[in-house]
From Swiss-Prot:
Gene name for this UniProt entry: rlmH
Main localization category: cytoplasm
Record's subcellular location: Cytoplasm
NCBIfam families: PRK00103.2-3
Single GO cellular component term: cytoplasm
Keyword check for Transcription regulation: no
The protein's name: Ribosomal RNA large subunit methyltransferase H
Species of origin: Chelativorans sp. (strain BNC1)
Pfam families for the chain: SPOUT_MTase
GO MF annotations in UniProt: rRNA (pseudouridine-N3-)-methyltransferase activity
Similarity comment text for this entry: Belongs to the RNA methyltransferase RlmH family.
Length: 173
């Protein structure tokens, strides 16, 4: 499933942002909140050369072993992310501030990448091959978060980093 938040932009200098998630987010308050932030990000992004293209969801693997599940999900992710910057949400990732994450996005955009794929793994996490291929791994802390809340937090951070890069006052500065 792919939910689109903006029409595809073809202008030079724009970078597409896509969220790739293992598992489907059901209707409910978490999805409504995530969609609200993603809609805001989609409207604000073009002013700074960023297009929120949408959310790609793939079903969780039904393979028997954890290793097989992670590999199967990882292959799909790597196929999807070809040619773009790959950012993993991963418990082993770096704990970046909103401004630092925004600076990384701007760096990817300014260095010629045409797409950023933000990847949320399945319940077993990311395969080692995916971790090795990632351009950046980030974490929302050492705690374990339900996937629905991770999506809300990611959506909010995308909106926040776009507003920071747009020059809106940021209360943490």
């Amino acid at each position: 499933m792919f939910r689109r938040y903006a029409d595809t932009l073809t202008s030079e200098g724009f970078i597409r942002i896509v969220i790739h998630a293992v598992g489907r987010m059901k209707a409910g308050p978490e999805r409504e909140l995530a969609d609200r932030y993603l809609d805001r990000a989609a409207k604000a992004g073009p002013a700074i050369g960023m297009e929120l293209a949408g959310v790609s969801e793939i079903p969780e693997s039904r393979a028997r072993s954890t290793l097989e599940r992670k590999r199967e999900e990882g292959r799909k992710l790597l196929d999807f992310a070809q040619g773009g910057a790959l950012i993993l949400l991963d418990e082993r990732g770096k704990n970046l501030s909103s401004r630092e994450l925004g600076d990384r996005f701007a760096s990817f955009r300014d260095s010629g990448f045409r797409q950023i794929v933000m990847a949320i793994g399945g319940p077993d996490g990311h395969d080692d091959a995916v971790r090795a291929a990632a351009d950046l791994s980030i974490s929302f802390g050492a705690q374990t978060w339900p996937h629905q809340l991770v999506r809300v937090m990611l959506a909010e951070q995308l909106y926040r980093l776009i507003t920071i890069l747009s020059g809106h006052p940021y209360h943490r500065d």
